[in-house]
Amino acid sequence: MIAGSLLPYQIVGDAIPASLTGVVGDAARGRAIVVDRRLGACLLCHSGPFSEEKFQGNLAPDLWGVGSRWSTGQMRLRLVDAGRLNPDTIMPPYYRVEGLTRVSAAWRGTPILTAEQVEDVVAFLTTLRD
């Protein structure tokens, strides 16, 4: 469980089974977050079915088919804190504020994404099926 300003969640195995907000996110908003280089910044490392985006990453797995590879809860944990599954990951924890280093004073205590935004991205990623 997370304390403080973040909503609590429970990790079960390799997943966070329950929605952070109690509701399913909006896939259209989630897609917008994924392609927004100022917000999610996902395409700095990942590529995917985003033909309008000319510069996509090649450091991390392609997002195409992610909805077939992982459950909703598995995707949620990877967004919240991928480091729990792979301590060597370069993927930032999008919904964690404790134990981080090299965080600007202006951003300390603030997650990269809100709980609602995490749920929106999860909703979008579940649509990316093989």
Predicted regions and their residues:
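Gly/Gly-Pro-rich "capping" loops immediately C-terminal to redox-active cysteine motifs
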Residues: 24, 33-35, 43, 47-81, ...
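An acidic site on a long C-lobe helix of protein kinase domains
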Residues: 26, 71, 113-117
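Cys/His-enriched microdomains
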Residues: 40
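Second-shell loop/turn segments in exported
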Residues: 17-20, 63-64, 107-111
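Electrostatic cytochrome c docking/interface patches
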Residues: 6-37
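Phosphate/oxyanion-binding loops and surfaces in catalytic or ligand/nucleic-acid-binding neighborhoods
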Residues: 82-85, 128
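C-terminal capping alpha-helices of c-type cytochrome domains
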Residues: 5, 77-78, 94-130
